[in-house]
Amino acid sequence: MKRYGNLIHDIADPETIKLALHQAAIGKRHRKSVSRRLNHEEETIQQIQYLLLSGEFKPAKVKTWTAHEQDKDRQITTTPFFPDQIIHWSIMLVLQPIFLKSMYEYNLATVTGRGMAQGRKVIPKWLQNDPKRTKYCLKMDIHHFYASINTDILKLKLQHRFKDPQVLRLLGVIIDSYSPGLPLGLYTSQWLANFYLEDFDHQVKNDWRVPHYVRYMDDLVMLSGNKKKLHRARDQMDAYLKAEGLIIKSNWQLFRVGSRPIDFLGYRFYRDHVTLRRKLALRIRRKAAKVGRKDRLTYHDAASMISYWGWLKHTNSYGFYHKYVKPNCSIKKAKGIVKHENNLRNRTGW
């Protein structure tokens, strides 16, 4: 595997920092701490460049808050916009293309152009086009993935990929500033967590010969025509991940496709159709009813309904949409409201 060097000057390049500044500011321009930095762009770029090249950057203390997502409580970490978030973005703008070169094709999280949409396309494609090798499904996830990452192993993996001492020192300072593992919520954490399982992904496909495999961060789905081989692969995965400090949750499932759907990414995949996960369908139904009871459609409600429409249009939910959504909310009207508000924000810099 090629090792990459001479990267710190790319990370500290004024154009990289400028792009990082504006990327980190998306959705936050109304905050005083962010607008102040945008209004003094050149000064901000020079300060970030100095911190990167001098090696004087020290991560600030983080703040944590609890997010309730799909019946789970997650501890989300946030850092100051300046300098931390800008520096995280500067680093990843340069390292992303390197990570992508060796990233497994169906590792869906974090990467623009992949995500849930690609998972929605590829799983039905496998089920319909390769019925012999999709008879059985092994579904499992990793317990407390981010917090369980062994940072010593992570830094060793980074040393095998990069040889720029300043970049390795910078990454090490960021990684060592949080414990245990990697903090959920930081831009660097997403990419480093995916990188941590890169070797595992290729092991699943190339060494353990699982015909079809897809991963969305810590959620894994494998398909095969041989139940015994999936059981054997699961044992190999369990041993491999334990050596990396990771534990497969005890609620893993191995079942025959057709006896039940594959519940993954918010969808329920059958051989010949796709529906929404029941809890998600109920959430959409309740939101649509709530919107329908209001006198007017607000920006936030419109944005929510457009997001839900994105789920519905990729499933066989025609009847559900016409019964529960269409009578309460016009998607066309919602799109108009969001477009108008976004144009207004772009003009005002908000």
Predicted regions and their residues:
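Non-catalytic, polymerase-adjacent accessory regions of viral genome-replication enzymes
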Residues: M1-Q46, G349-W350
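A common structural junction motif
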Residues: D238-L246
